[in-house]
């Protein structure tokens, strides 16, 4: 059974606290916009599609509870008053993680719905209901998109390997970075969804994944997802990618994305660029799998993508259960560096240039570069 990042029931929202995984499964209830913002900011929930879903759902919850109030809040006095209240709420949610374009796409979509409903002359109650429905739709649409892009990418990759005369009798060996499965989305996943699809169709031999320091999304989250799904897998340290390519038959690297520029430059979890450079050296296809909402056509290239800088202390700490242990799941956080370091560089993301990317997959299909081109035309897949 696949893991889930968000579960809802009526007006109740709960997220799995990913900071405690894989050793403790704890659901945290989200009751306010501020709690949703904090959960995203502190990475209790992460993954571009998942944080967009949580933001949209918490916004729907905010309005749903407002409609249940008696009397209605003062900002329901007029459409203009409602707009003046809601626009700052959406802007605040967007500040939680600025690099992930899905979050911005969700807040812009809700803003568009707000303005359209006002322009149609609807009552404040009807405007609020439109926004509630739109917020829920943003989250609900994610799973279908993920399954579509996973099939597009999986079939394309398998056909490419076969057409190139590659050995895939036992299935494909695929490396991924970070965590892009059900924990990073509303379900199934993007790059990890592609791996899951290959496994489900008998076309996967083994999945490989990097630990993805300093937050260890690979060793904590991807490891747990693959184990839960019974997908054969091997973990490697981030610094072992080159060695893996030298000694094993790896057919592709598949990664997700937090933002894709118009030309195909892709921002993803730190360490992605390293893997792309080494993959190019070994002529291994490098594939980005992400929903259309991750493509930001307003950004010309990766140079214009803002890169979130995480607190320096996060690069100095690791969390896990005590080892050896007596069977309990008591966790500890320890510092692995000396105190008082002169400096710590801790970006959450890096940008892989389009020239290093073989294909970009969305729910609409697979985009490849033209002959001799170093940039993508993403028009057919957005």
Swiss-Prot record:
GO MF annotations in UniProt: S-methyl-5-thioribose-1-phosphate isomerase activity
Record flagged with keyword Lipid metabolism: no
Enzyme nomenclature, EC number: 5.3.1.23
Main location: cytoplasm
Catalytic residues in the record: 258 (proton donor)
Catalytic activity: 5-(methylsulfanyl)-alpha-D-ribose 1-phosphate = 5-(methylsulfanyl)-D-ribulose 1-phosphate
SUPFAM superfamilies in the cross-refs: NagB/RpiA/CoA transferase-like (SSF100950)
Biological pathway: Amino-acid biosynthesis; L-methionine biosynthesis via salvage pathway; L-methionine from S-methyl-5-thio-alpha-D-ribose 1-phosphate: step 1/6
Residues marked Transition state stabilizer (site): 178
Function text: Catalyzes the interconversion of methylthioribose-1-phosphate (MTR-1-P) into methylthioribulose-1-phosphate (MTRu-1-P).
Protein name, per record: Methylthioribose-1-phosphate isomerase
Species of the source: Laccaria bicolor (strain S238N-H82 / ATCC MYA-4686) (Bicoloured deceiver)
